[in-house]
Regions:
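Face-selective signature of the C-terminal outer-membrane beta-barrel domain
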Residues: 299-327, 350-500, 507, 568-576, ...
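Surface-exposed extracellular loop regions of Gram-negative outer-membrane beta-barrel proteins
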Residues: 485, 510-557, 574-592, 707-722
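Short acidic/polar hinge/loop motifs at secondary-structure boundaries
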Residues: 175-202, 304
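Short, acidic, small-residue-rich periplasmic hinge/interaction motif at the N-terminus
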Residues: 40-44, 77-79, 95-134, 143, ...
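Short, acidic Ser/Thr/Gly-rich low-complexity loop/linker segments typical of extracellular
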Residues: 47-61
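Extracytoplasmic beta-strand/coil segments of soluble accessory domains associated
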Residues: 142-177
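N-terminal periplasmic accessory domains that precede
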Residues: 96-101, 111, 141-144, 160-162, ...
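Outer membrane beta-barrel strand-and-loop segments of large Gram-negative receptors
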Residues: 413-415, 455, 461, 546, ...
Length: 772
């Protein structure tokens, strides 16, 4: 009898535990007998720790799943409505709250409607809930991101790019998995529940990640989804088109996505001023005056995907990708020595390049008991690169200099990664992982100078990171061990590293917080720089690889303060970076009096960057203004040079939306970069955009640089022996008109899509370039 009681009790406890792991909270938000669409719904603990959140659908409904037993507060708010808080004490079973009534309210302050903040500051990320107006006026996931105005994030709809003011890349994700920009372009705004913004990402996201933007989207069931996003110019060969299809059947999902990019302009040219100084003290300056020529590029990206989910317990995903890119460039210029302008030579340069990159990505994710998870990912990639370049200098049809070079490259790589995560307490989490990468590059160089390279590269890392929160104080500490190996014939290196990372934050109130972040990382030389290869640039210059390059160390420190008051918000950010023995360029004269441009481990490089960002809006739910400005100070020390440089930059943007219409105007001046001995001028541009949305169709237009007729970019080289300055121009980048159409349709979707949480990729071909 006692055994039966014990067995029955055990079974009952197990059922309660299993049931508690799938607690649901749902309801319907109504005001004056009408459903409230896109109301913000947030579930949090009694001490304001975020648990789950989202927005109501078109019928005012919401549902939150997989909630653990406990006591919570359900906060409901919406633009033009009073907020309501519902206490959910001792929640242990699923609960249907039924109809929840909220009252209309409009608070006016000097003719401006003040709305509640939609940003929740969690310990390791910011949780941003889109407003109803943003969801209705945005045409896709990218335009929604632009309207949400995340701090230190820049959205460029003309080029379909998302960048950060900080050093590194921006990772785009959907439900935790790395997503391509093409996925965001065909994402329906109404499917977005919230955006989780990791502006200080942890070790699991990699060393070169400035920010992670994770779209948390609705999970659908059976049916399918078709979407198209087309962006094309009627007067210039300029286009970016995306198409995606997803079909669900029971526990399986099949997907196909295709992207096509093309560019072609007939009015591209460059101007160069190059000075060459010899050991005997003599020197001369050569001038290159460009003649308008053609450049073109196009690419295709195809992905086939299959995934299988078993009731949210485990998830398998397989993806086969193929990317193809081809470019052509023709340059014509007149060459002459500044001291002898009458002696003119004609320069002709023609180059083509082609890259084919197939890959296979296998992914497995498993949810374990006690709030644990395990992720395993394996990616294999092959990159086939073919390029050739011809360069001549001469008079009429008599070449005085004739250079021809070809590169045939083959690179094979494998990336394997495993991640384990566990929630230790309600306010702390442990994350640990291992990653292994193996690469083999086999390149053949031909033409005037021939050579072959075979390079092997291995990287292995393991990390552990612990994060938590105590009242208003939050922290994170991580430690990463790494091993790097490179071998080319008898040359190479082996390097072991132990790298710490620290994050400390304090939240003074819901609207003010301050954070410090420090880390040490290593940077490896690229395979393209380490090949024992020489490539002729022109009659005077040579580009050379350097197999003696070594890994170098990077130290980063960041201090940030964020504040919000009504319609005003701001961010103050101060960063300092120091690189010890960085790989930077140098120019030397060889025994043949040729000027050899190569890379070497130099002494140090420093960058100091204070930045201020201010935002105002939305004013009457129509206008939003933003302005950011900063200063970059660089200190670059080489073995035989020392340069300092200071650059002031700014960026301004105004956005407007009214009913189904939305528009924006953004402008940015040169944000220059100085590294080694090279000053690279950033873009100075402005863009105007207007769009109209009707149901699932969004049509619009954009104009790049509508108010100028001279677009250029360039740079300077401050070498002692061969300084230079260059500008290159693209006439078609002025008053470039682009029409845009976005359309999507879904049918019968009820299957809950579970996304993978990591994605690895290899896109570096590892070949040395020979052009200027």
């Amino acid at each position: 009898m006692i055994k039966r009681i014990l067995v029955a009790t055990s079974l009952l406890c197990m059922c309660c535990i299993l049931f508690a792991q799938n607690v649901q909270v749902k309801g319907k938000v109504v005001s004056e007998n009408e459903a409230v669409e896109f109301a913000n719904v947030v579930l949090q603990t009694k001490d304001s720790i975020f648990i789950a959140g989202g927005v109501t659908d078109s019928k005012g409904r919401f549902m939150m799943e997989n909630i653990q037993a406990g006591s919570y507060l359900l906060c409901i708010s919406g633009m033009g409505y009073t907020s309501r808080i519902i206490s959910l004490d001792h929640l242990a079973v699923s609960k249907d709250l039924g109809v929840i009534m909220i009252s209309p309210e409009s608070i006016l302050l000097k003719e401006v409607v003040v709305t509640g903040a939609s940003v929740i500051n969690a310990a390791d990320r910011k949780i941003i809930l889109p407003t109803a107006h943003q969801l209705k006026s945005a045409g896709n996931g990218l335009s929604l991101l632009q309207q949400m105005k995340l701090s230190r994030i820049q959205v460029d709809q003309m080029r379909n790019k998302v960048t950060s003011s900080g050093e590194g890349d921006v990772q785009l994700r959907m439900n935790g998995v790395n997503a391509e920009i093409q996925d965001i372009l065909v994402l329906r705004p109404e499917d977005v529940i919230r955006i989780e913004y990791h502006d200080a990402p942890g070790l699991r996201y990699g060393d070169n990640t400035a920010a992670v933007i994770d779209y948390i989207v609705r999970r659908h069931e059976t049916g399918g989804y078709v979407a198209l996003d087309a962006q094309d110019s009627p007067h210039v060969l300029f286009g970016n088109n995306n198409f995606i299809v997803k079909i669900n059947h029971k526990k399986s999902e099949f997907g196909l996505n295709y992207n096509n990019v093309y560019r072609s302009v007939d009015n591209y040219w460059r101007n160069n001023w190059e000075t060459f100084r010899y050991e005997d003290g003599s020197s001369f300056t050569r001038v290159e005056d460009g003649i308008p020529s053609r450049i073109s590029t196009y690419g295709h990206n195809i992905g086939l995907n299959y995934s299988f989910q078993d009731q949210g317990k485990w998830f398998f995903n397989s993806t086969v990708r193929w990317a193809f890119n081809k470019n052509k460039q023709n340059n014509q210029s007149s060459l002459y020595i500044l001291e002898k302008p009458e002696e003119i030579l004609m320069m002709k340069e023609h180059s083509t390049g082609r890259t084919s990159r197939p890959s296979v990505d296998l992914y497995f994710q498993c949810k374990l008991n006690n709030d644990q998870s395990l992720i395993i990912n394996a990616v294999t990639t092959y990159i086939d690169t073919q390029s050739d370049r011809s360069y001549t200098e001469g008079k009429s049809n008599e070449p005085l200099t004739d250079i021809y070079s070809t590169v045939s490259g083959n690179k094979y790589s494998f990336i394997g990664e495993g991640i384990y995560e566990r929630k230790v307490t309600k306010k702390s989490r442990l994350s640990a992982g291992v990653k292994y990468q193996q690469s083999l590059a086999d390149n053949t160089y031909g033409g005037n100078e021939s050579s072959e390279t075979k390079m092997h590269e291995t990287h292995a890392t393991a990390y552990v990171e612990y994060s938590g929160k105590m009242d208003r104080f939050n922290y994170s500490f991580g430690l990463q061990g790494s091993y790097a190996r490179f071998k080319q014939k008898e040359e190479g290196y082996n390097r072991y590293s132990l790298l710490p990372r620290l994050r400390l934050g304090y939240q003074f109130s819901d609207n003010v917080f301050i954070r410090y972040r420090g880390q040490i990382s290593r940077k490896s030389p690229g395979l393209s720089d380490m090949g024992n290869v020489r490539q002729l640039i022109d009659s005077l210059q040579v580009r050379s690889g350097n197999p003696e390059l070594k890994i170098f160390t990077v130290y980063k420190n960041e201090l940030e303060a964020d504040f919000r008051k009504g319609l005003f918000s701001g961010n103050v950010h101060l960063s300092y970076q120091y690189q010890h023995r960085p790989i930077m360029e140098e120019t030397i004269r060889d025994k043949n009096n040729s000027f050899v441009r190569t890379n070497a481990n130099q002494l140090s490089w420093q960058k100091l960057n204070p930045e201020l960002e201010l935002k105002l809006g939305p004013l009457k739910d129509i206008l939003t203004f933003s302005f950011s400005t900063g200063i970059n100070y660089y200190d670059s020390r080489g073995l035989d040079y020392h340069h300092t440089y200071t650059n002031w930059y700014y960026r301004a943007e105004v956005m407007a939306s009214y009913k189904r219409w939305s528009g924006f105007f953004q402008m940015e001046n040169h944000r220059n970069n100085f590294y080694g001995e090279t000053l690279s001028y950033g873009e100075s541009f402005h863009t105007l955009g207007l769009s109209y949305r009707y149901k699932r169709l969004n049509i619009g237009m954009m104009i790049l640089n509508p108010f100028v007729d001279n677009y250029r970019m360039g740079g300077e080289m401050f070498s002692k022996v061969a300084p230079s300055k260059n500008w290159w121009y693209v006439k078609e980048s002025c008053r470039l008109f682009v029409a845009k159409v976005s359309w999507n349709i879904s049918f019968g979707r009820k299957y809950e899509t579970m996304q993978k949480r990591v994605n690895n990729e290899d896109s570096n071909a590892g070949t040395l370039k020979s052009g200027k």
